[in-house]
UniProtKB/Swiss-Prot annotation:
GO terms for biological process: rRNA base methylation. Keywords: Cytoplasm, Methyltransferase, rRNA processing, S-adenosyl-L-methionine, Transferase. Signal peptide: none annotated. Disulfide bonds: none annotated. It comes from the Bacteria. GO terms for cellular component: cytoplasm. Its EC number is 2.1.1.199. PANTHER family: 12S RRNA N4-METHYLCYTIDINE METHYLTRANSFERASE, S-ADENOSYL-METHYLTRANSFERASE MRAW. The gene is rsmH. This is Ribosomal RNA small subunit methyltransferase H.
């Protein structure tokens, strides 16, 4: 079935689109089109227009029917959402009324064995959301033991990362690791899960997937881009699924919504005027009914903010974690 043929309701979809408050004549960016859930909900507002972005060619192909149905109201672009400012400019939209993002891998991608995202199915060890750049198999084959340990620890939050990296290096000296099952079996030998705990390979797969797709760097850059394209009163809604993503979103919005500074002990420090106003102090989470229907919703957090009239802040430096280019360049 094509993604566009489903009536998929994304996690916290009504809540996220509710924060956007779409209106007739408004232009909205769906930075992570996927199966088109957010886009469909936005298009329910008559007269609204959506610029939808996805780096996955499968999602783009699957959205063809929705594009045909929506006509001029929907433009679907294959690109990274970090490039959303350039995408909007190319579509004649210097500013937009709202941006929504759903961070991380989609259920559609996880369920396709040939994409290599999940240890639940045996398939090629790929994990790329697009079809360009090194695959997870390339990283596993070429990264040094130290780099592998850092990738799995930083992006997968796996406390046994050094044990996993050592096991991978030992195994690849005997035979290439090219399938999801092969990698999951290697990890399961050194990470012992207790009954009721997540699969022992969960964090290793997460770390490699985030690294291969440069997901956290992409998120940093996409947030900066959204800040630049949102018009005053425009709204940003971001759904994240684990602590690494949520921490980035929370920090970004907190820093850009700060007012004042200083105290009776320290002088006030000049700082840029707030570029966002938070729509809620705490993240919005899924209710019991949604979690029962979709267990993936359990970890979801939605944060939203409204753009002020202040200029966009200067883009921050990316954290100094391992990069795909540097690891592959240094690889054996």
């Amino acid at each position: 079935m094509k993604p566009s043929d489903t009536r998929h309701i994304p996690v916290l979809g009504p809540e996220a689109v509710g924060l956007l408050a779409p209106r007739a004549g408004g232009i909205y960016v769906d930075g992570t089109f996927g199966a088109g859930g957010y886009t469909r909900l936005i298009l329910e507002t008559a007269g609204s227009r959506v610029i939808a972005i996805d780096r996955d060619p499968t999602a783009i192909a699957g959205g063809a029917d929705l594009v045909a149905d929506a006509g001029h109201r929907l433009t679907l672009v294959q690109d990274r959402f970090s490039n959303l400012a350039d995408v909007c400019a190319a579509q004649g939209a210097a500013t937009v009324d709202g941006v929504v993002m759903d961070i991380g891998v989609s259920s559609m991608q996880l369920d396709q064995a040939e994409r290599g995202f999940s240890f639940r199915f045996d398939g090629p060890l790929d994990m790329r959301m697009g079809r360009d750049g090194p695959s997870a198999a390339d990283v596993v084959a070429r990264a040094s033991e130290t780099d592998l340990a850092n990738i799995i620890y930083i992006f997968g939050e796996e406390r046994y990362s050094r044990h996993v990296a050592r096991a991978i290096v030992a195994a690849r000296s005997d035979a290439p690791i090219t399938t999801t099952k092969a990698l999951a079996d290697i990890v399961a030998k050194v990470v012992r899960a207790k009954p009721g705990e997540i699969h022992p390979a969960t964090r290793t797969f997460q770390g490699l997937r985030i690294f291969v797709n440069e997901e956290l760097d992409e998120l940093h850059q996409a947030l900066d881009a959204a800040e630049r394209v949102l018009k005053p009163g425009g709204r940003l809604a971001v759904v994240s699924f684990h602590s690494l993503e949520d921490r980035i979103v929370k920090t970004f919005l907190t820093e850009r919504s700060k007012t004042g500074g200083g105290s009776r002990h320290l002088p006030e420090v000049a700082q840029a005027a707030p570029s966002f106003t938070l729509l809620s102090k705490r993240p919005i989470v899924a209710g019991d009914a949604e979690v029962a229907a979709n267990p993936r919703a359990r970890s979801a957090k939605l944060r939203g903010a409204e753009r002020t009239e202040a200029p966009a802040h200067a883009a921050g430096d990316l954290p100094g974690w391992p990069t795909l280019a540097s690891v592959m360049r240094a690889g054996r």
